[in-house]
């Protein structure tokens, strides 16, 4: 037999990058929730979380497709649907550009 897919450095590095993007977004989400639960404004953190996680979902979906090769593009794999959903997620509750502009206005008086 051959090697397991995770034993290839390019694949394992891609998976590590996927994990880092997800965990970074998760920490932002937890901070926004903590601020809100503390009775403080989480307006900027919520916008940042939406942008970071939406972009992570797109990038992670693209990486998953690349890891799976042509199988990832087949509808049976559901990975192609994940990518379509991820791209659409950039438009729900404000586009990435609008939310980024909002954050820019909040951090640059």
Regions found by a protein language model. Give the residues of each.
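Alpha-helical interface subdomain recognition
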Residues: 1-109
